[in-house]
């Protein structure tokens, strides 16, 4: 290899010594432009280009270097460039070694400039050129390694320094690209001589200790440099001076008029709609029809030209939240002079709906067949489509939160309440209007769900059982707790940089997982059709499975008791929608309560098992056991439930409402609901109604449970009276638990249960809500207050989110503290209880181990309490959003999972005198949230002795009845809370003492803890034996939390020397905080890392180490779901992840183990094939129903719309990569789509430019469609004026891309023919429109737009008009690459492209200065837009 290099050096010396290249290239091989700033190369050969860049005569122009490495790939290969630079380097060494002084000076200057070129190339374009090309890396390393001998001997020292710097540059870049590759540290290179002699190996040549090839992982920097367009654009701009303001070329006033006309025509036909814009000549091409028209054909209708033949609907923002609703909630006045505003309730229903009787003959007919009942029909159809069931009456499936959010954010209904408005205009607007275009977007997603349900029905029908949706598919589609948190409960959104506009509801992932589920279910159905049904296994083998199903059904059954008063917190008019049996508008059984304000109710927590369901059925077990997993948590039943759980969206806190319905036929369906008295008795542990939370024990005749008065109980809940229609009457006495002086408990009143059957379920009084227990019942809970001797307790339902919470101690077991005193436990019978001796021995052994562990924990707890390390207070008035970590992790006593046992020692016999003075709200972790601010949080933990005594408990006796308990903890089971805790300020999160709920969020706490404990590469939560990670956690805690360090030092047993001091810079690295200085010192080899003392052993000997390890372990970080570290403040977006992983550099280039893609990867093509089967069939969304359409833009003010459109366009432009622009990587024709969802499915095949163009054209189509579908002249006038105002605000925000979208749409032939609406436009708005209309003029090749783009104020932000840049690049691309083929390069062409690209990416980067908050509701509507097809527009405009 070195011999080859010598040959190249000889040939290079001969070429660069020629007269045309020495000392600088002559005019015969290179041409410069006359005048201008700096040197502008017009044409040259490749050798002359290298000679000019390394010329020892001309001045250094760093911008010329940067431009060259951006464009050289268009006419020169990377390997050829490396050969030329090697030849120039060797030629310089030859000149230095010559005897002449002049030649030596020329050689030294040329050598330095050649080194600068090589270093610039390696550092800035390693990921672009060297990373994917192994041969190029090997060639470069062979060249650099061969310079070690040439630099020795009698050569000048400058040569040795350059060689060492070049090797350090390579090592520095390698350390940036790979995470675990540090050549300097690994090979101990500490001197210049060591660097000279060191032979740099390639990453593919490194071996492990076992002799295997090392598998190095690419760093985050490498992946971003390879796949993230925004990061790559920012890296390119960093190579230039920040003060540079790159300009677009502007034509002179005296340019050729004929040429300008030619450019005008050709530019318009490239990207925009020539036949739609009045600024361009219209064509007579007929639109192509690819779909069957959903409307009758009219041959006599006059044909006009309308939207372009290619609907390049935007591809860009594939993942922002669905449009919140296609309905209008408020009409803002179109102009300031119009003092008129209509307020619309999106959940309003005309009074006739409330009077709807259950009898079909008594129902009142609406005025229009497509009135509000069409709206309710759509909602009901979507709701029922979400449920996977066998019969229409079966409502046992759970509605996916993501799909409910989709409907919630998309659908809205217009209703007008105008006390001072134009009465005549109000009468002309129907109260049942909604945005049909937005509803179409929902319908497309619902189509996929329908297909999934149909396939699921086939699968389950073959099995002869109730359909159960695949839990894995559901979990993959809708992630658990953290990802399902309500959007309003997220951390407050900052500026747009902290908000992922492209990924709001993650619709791309939702659609992908639905399609994956459909394909998997289809394969399963085809496979099961050929299988022979096998007989069920023996009953003995089914017991574990049956037990699992029994437990699962019991835990979910308890959810049915989460009751609340039959009232509403919000008094505004709203629509109450019960799920109908079908999508039919006249379906029977739908009724609306007239006594209360109606509400829109989305059912997200339907019951799996009902209070009337029998828990155990041997035959059912035999039928289902072979198909049920041991850990199955989804057990469904075809019988209708007694209650429906609903969630309202009228308030920030969702209320769970439990209503009984459809019980008239329940008794005959459950005649076998009585208990079998021959079954063995199961003793229930005190305070635990969930079977998962207590141990199974054999019952003996002498046990206290044997003497308990037996009542009919429900096996799934432990509730008395397990008959199908048993309802607890509101008049029944409520048992009150009292404690006598001797410590025994008794009930004050014994409730009586009556079996009642009601035919009219809606005539009942609302049920008394049952007790709400804390969701985490570890080592006892507040249930001790009322579960002592209650013979018939109402079951205590767990919080629905408990399954996602961390509920076990670090040991993974659940223990229950037993209290002294005579008591009896409620009993229930278990059909599966094993009374054999072996089972009894195991039970006794487990009980002994449990007691031993409890004793150890009590001892450890006592030791920690006496240490005195409690200084922080638990104050609600704090300004921080979370409690300090040292309070959270002070001791095991303060752990969230250990605090539940604190309240078990509260006695029940104290006076309740202070009950009415200050109501107490029970925390799910046992923290007294009503304590005064002056009380210390540690004080609540340091007095266990006082708490055990009734006389010392100030809060005892406050909740002695079920009613009192419920009143003070009525929010404890809110489904959207993390652990069911709400303080006085409405803050429902545990560790957030802020004043409002907006400052508190579980994700905030998670991110705080993650930042403090999970910043290391290895998992921060370590097992007890991982001492190294423990030391890192302790060190990080002390660095981030000074108070924790102070606490540690207060312990007299700890050695102060064991604490790791913060890292300090050495004397020679005083400026190491400057990244530029650090980089230079690393390149020169003068940077030395401060020595770190190994204090691991001393730390591990500290008694605090094991305590902290257990505390951190109890937080169970490994089971919590965190977003990826690279998107700390952003939601995960599968759409963005797919776009970032489409280009594989090599096997490890795009691997990211932190990416949580729950479902198997399915190509967009396969998903599109499923969506192609969709055809619009719902008549309510047909264009024949346009009289009920109203644009959602009338719901918001123009400034808000302009802001959200600006955020969207910023994200769109960030997807355009500089190299795609230089190469003009774009499709000649884009797919014809009419909705954003359809574009989502073209993610893998569209470049950033294609996305931007498609988004642009879709927006134009959408604006035209909104105006075409608005039949009311005044509403259309208002919509046009609203769009004019939006465009004007966008112009002020320097968002010229949106300005052009609106202007082109309003100036289209289709919209301009609405002369009756244009006549009503206000004169001031017409003046604004005339000014806006002049901006996109094609005269002189967008002369007006170019002047605006060249005069932008960077601080205000900017969204450039993409079409201007694409037209310039397209015109410039028609020039020749070579003036003389393969000899003389037309370098001016490529340098012009660079100037255009730099101007574009610079203005896109200026968009970061926008300070705009994302409005989730409006943003969703603006992103997930839908447009009419060209045929539909032609049909509507033909009359």
Curated annotation (Swiss-Prot):
Quote the PANTHER family the UniProt record gives: GUANINE NUCLEOTIDE EXCHANGE FACTOR, PROTEIN SON OF SEVENLESS
Q: Which GO terms describe its molecular function?
A: guanyl-nucleotide exchange factor activity
- Provide the leader sequence positions: none
Gene that encodes the chain: LTE1
Q: Upper taxonomic classification of the species?
A: Eukaryota, Fungi, Dikarya, Ascomycota, Saccharomycotina
**Which residue intervals are annotated with compositional bias (Polar residues) in the record?**
699-711, 822-832, 1054-1073
Q: Which UniProt keywords apply?
A: Cell cycle, Cell division, Cytoplasm, Guanine-nucleotide releasing factor, Mitosis
* Protein name per the record: Guanine nucleotide exchange factor LTE1
Q: Which SUPFAM superfamilies match?
A: Ras GEF (SSF48366)
Q: Where in the cell is it found?
A: Cytoplasm; Bud
CDD domains in the cross-refs: RasGEF, REM
């Amino acid at each position: 290899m070195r011999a080859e290099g010598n040959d190249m050096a000889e040939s290079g010396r001969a070429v660069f010594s020629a007269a045309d290249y020495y000392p600088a290239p002559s005019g015969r091989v290179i041409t410069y432009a006359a005048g201008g700033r700096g040197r502008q190369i017009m044409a040259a050969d490749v050798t002359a280009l290298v000679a000019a860049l390394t010329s020892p005569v001309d001045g250094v122009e760093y911008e010329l270097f940067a431009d060259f490495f951006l464009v050289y790939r268009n006419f020169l290969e990377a390997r050829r460039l490396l050969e030329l630079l090697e030849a120039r380097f060797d030629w310089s060494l030859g000149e230095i070694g010559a005897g002449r002084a002049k030649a030596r000076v020329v050689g030294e200057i040329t050598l330095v400039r050649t080194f600068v070129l090589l270093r610039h190339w390696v550092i800035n374009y390693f990921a672009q050129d060297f990373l994917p090309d192994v041969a190029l890396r090997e060639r470069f390393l062979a060249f650099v390694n061969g310079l070690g001998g040439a630099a020795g001997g009698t050569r000048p020292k400058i040569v040795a320094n350059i060689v060492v710097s070049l090797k350090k540059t390579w090592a520095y870049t390698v350390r940036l690209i790979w995470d675990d590759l540090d050549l300097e540290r690994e090979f101990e290179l500490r001197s210049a001589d060591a660097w000279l002699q060191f032979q740099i190996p390639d990453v593919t040549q490194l071996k492990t200790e076992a002799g295997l090839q090392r598998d190095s992982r690419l760093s985050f920097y490498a992946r971003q440099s390879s796949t993230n367009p925004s990061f790559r654009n920012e890296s390119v701009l960093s190579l230039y001076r920040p003060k540079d303001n790159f300009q677009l070329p502007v034509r002179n006033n005296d340019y050729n008029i004929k040429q300008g006309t030619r450019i005008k025509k050709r530019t318009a036909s490239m990207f925009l709609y020539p036949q739609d814009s009045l600024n361009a000549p219209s064509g007579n091409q007929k639109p192509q029809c690819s779909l069957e028209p959903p409307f009758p054909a009219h041959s006599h209708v006059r044909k006009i030209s309308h939207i372009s033949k290619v609907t390049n609907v935007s591809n860009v923002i594939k993942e922002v939240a669905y449009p919140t609703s296609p309905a209008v909630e408020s009409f803002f006045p179109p102009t300031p002079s119009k003092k008129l505003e209509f307020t619309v309730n999106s959940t309003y229903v005309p009074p006739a709906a409330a009077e709807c009787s259950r009898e079909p003959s008594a129902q009142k007919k609406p005025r229009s067949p497509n009135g509000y009942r069409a709206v309710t029909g759509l909602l009901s159809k979507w709701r029922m489509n979400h449920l996977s069931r066998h019969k229409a009456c079966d409502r046992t499936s759970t509605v996916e939160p993501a799909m409910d959010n989709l409907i919630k954010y998309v659908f809205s209904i217009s209703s007008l309440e105008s006390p001072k408005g134009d009465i005549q205009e109000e009468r002309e607007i129907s109260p049942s209007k909604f945005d049909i275009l937005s509803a179409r977007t929902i319908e497309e997603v619902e189509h996929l769900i329908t297909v999934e349900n149909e396939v699921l029905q086939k699968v389950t029908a073959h099995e002869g059982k109730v359909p159960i949706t695949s839990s894995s598919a559901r979990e993959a589609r809708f992630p658990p707790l953290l990802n399902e948190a309500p959007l309003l409960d997220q951390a407050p959104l900052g500026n747009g940089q902290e908000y992922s506009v492209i990924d709001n509801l993650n619709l791309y992932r939702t659609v992908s997982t639905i399609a994956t589920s459909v394909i998997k279910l289809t394969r399963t159905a085809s496979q099961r059709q050929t299988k022979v049904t096998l007989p069920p296994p023996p009953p003995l083998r089914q017991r574990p499975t049956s037990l699992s199903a029994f437990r699962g059904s019991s835990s979910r059954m308890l959810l049915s008791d989460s009751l609340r008063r039959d009232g509403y917190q919000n008094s505004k008019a709203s629509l109450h929608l019960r799920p109908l049996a079908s999508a039919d508008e006249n379906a029977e059984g739908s009724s609306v309560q007239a006594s209360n304000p109606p509400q829109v109710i989305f059912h997200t927590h339907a019951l799996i098992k009902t209070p009337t369901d029998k828990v155990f059925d041997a035959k059912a077990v035999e039928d289902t056991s072979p198909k049920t997993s041991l850990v199955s948590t989804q057990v469904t039943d075809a019988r209708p439930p007694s209650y429906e759980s609903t969630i309202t969206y009228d308030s920030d806190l969702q209320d769970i409402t439990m209503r009984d319905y459809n019980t008239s036929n329940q008794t005959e369906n459950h005649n076998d609901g009585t208990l079998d008295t021959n079954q063995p008795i199961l003793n229930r542990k005190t305070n635990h109604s969930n079977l998962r939370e207590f141990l199974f024990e054999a019952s003996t005749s002498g046990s206290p449970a044997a003497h308990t008065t037996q009542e009919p109980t429900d096996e799934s809940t432990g509730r008395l009276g397990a008959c199908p229609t048993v309802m607890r009457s509101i008049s029944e006495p409520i048992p009150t638990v009292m404690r006598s002086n001797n410590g025994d408990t008794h009930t004050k009143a014994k409730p009586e249960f009556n079996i009642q059957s009601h035919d009219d379920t809606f005539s009942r009084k609302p049920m008394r809500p049952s007790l709400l227990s804390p969701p985490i019942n570890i080592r006892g809970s507040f249930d001790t207050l009322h579960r002592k001797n209650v013979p018939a307790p109402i079951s205590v339902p767990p919080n629905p989110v408990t399954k996602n919470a961390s509920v076990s101690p670090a040991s993974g077991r659940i223990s229950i503290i037993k209290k002294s005193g005579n008591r009896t436990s409620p009993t229930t019978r278990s059909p599966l209880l094993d009374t054999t001796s072996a089972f009894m021995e195991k039970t006794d052994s487990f009980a002994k181990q449990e007691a031993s562990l409890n004793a150890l924990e009590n001892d450890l707890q006592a030791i920690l309490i006496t240490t005195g390390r409690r200084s922080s207070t638990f104050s609600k008035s704090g300004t921080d959003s979370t409690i300090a970590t040292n309070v959270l992790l002070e001791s095991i006593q303060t752990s969230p999972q250990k605090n539940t046992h604190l309240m078990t020692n509260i006695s029940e016999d104290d006076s309740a005198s202070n009950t009415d003075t200050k109501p107490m709200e029970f925390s799910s972790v046992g923290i007294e949230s009503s304590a005064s601010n002056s009380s210390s949080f540690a004080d609540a933990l340091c007095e266990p002795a006082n708490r055990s005594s009734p006389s010392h408990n100030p809060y005892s006796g406050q909740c002695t009845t079920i009613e009192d308990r419920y009143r003070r903890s009525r929010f404890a089971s809110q489904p959207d809370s993390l652990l069911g805790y709400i303080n006085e300020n409405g803050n429902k999160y545990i560790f957030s003492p802020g004043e409002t709920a907006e400052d508190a969020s579980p994700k905030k706490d998670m991110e705080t803890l993650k930042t403090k404990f999970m910043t290391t590469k290895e998992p921060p939560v370590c097992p007890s034996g991982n001492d190294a990670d423990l030391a890192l956690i302790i060190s990080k805690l002390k660095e981030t939390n000074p108070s924790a360090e102070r606490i540690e030092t207060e312990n007299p047993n700890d050695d102060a020397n064991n604490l790791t001091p913060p890292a300090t810079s050495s004397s020679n690295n005083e400026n190491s905080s400057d990244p530029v200085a650090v980089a230079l010192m690393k390149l020169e080899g003068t940077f030395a890392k401060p020595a770190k003392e190994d204090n691991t052993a001393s730390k591990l000997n500290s008694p605090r180490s094991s305590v902290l390890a257990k505390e951190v372990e109890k937080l169970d970080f490994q089971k919590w779901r965190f977003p990826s570290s690279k998107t700390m403040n952003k939601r995960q977006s599968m759409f963005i992840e797919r776009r970032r992983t489409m280009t594989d550099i090599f096997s490890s280039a795009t691997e990211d183990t932190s990416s949580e893609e729950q479902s198997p990867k399915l190509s967009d093509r396969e998903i599109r094939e499923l969506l192609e089967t969709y055809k619009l069939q719902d008549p309510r969304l047909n264009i024949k129903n346009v009289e009920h359409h109203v644009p959602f833009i009338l719901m918001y003010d123009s400034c808000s719309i302009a802001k959200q459109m600006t955020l969207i366009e910023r994200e769109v432009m960030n997807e355009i990569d500089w190299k795609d622009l230089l190469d003009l990587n774009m499709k000649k024709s884009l797919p014809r789509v009419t909705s954003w969802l359809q574009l989502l499915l073209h993610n893998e095949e569209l470049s950033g430019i294609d996305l931007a163009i498609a988004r642009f054209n879709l927006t134009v189509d959408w604006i035209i469609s909104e105006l075409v579908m608005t039949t009311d002249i005044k509403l259309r006038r208002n919509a046009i004026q609203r769009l004019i105002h939006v465009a004007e605000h966008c112009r002020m925000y320097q968002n010229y891309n949106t300005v052009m979208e609106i202007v082109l749409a309003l100036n289209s032939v289709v919209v301009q023919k609405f002369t009756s609406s244009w006549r009503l436009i206000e004169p001031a708005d017409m003046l604004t429109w005339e000014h806006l209309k002049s901006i996109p003029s094609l005269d002189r090749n967008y002369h007006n737009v170019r002047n605006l783009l060249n005069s932008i104020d960077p601080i205000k932000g900017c969204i450039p008009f993409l079409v201007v840049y694409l037209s310039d690049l397209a015109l410039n691309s028609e020039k020749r690459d070579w003036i003389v083929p393969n000899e003389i390069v037309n370098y001016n062409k490529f340098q012009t492209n660079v100037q255009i690209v730099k101007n574009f990416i610079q203005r896109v980067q200026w968009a970061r200065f926008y300070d705009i908050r994302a409005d989730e509701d409006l943003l969703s509507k603006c992103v997930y837009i839908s447009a009419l097809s060209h045929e539909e527009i032609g049909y509507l405009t033909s009359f």
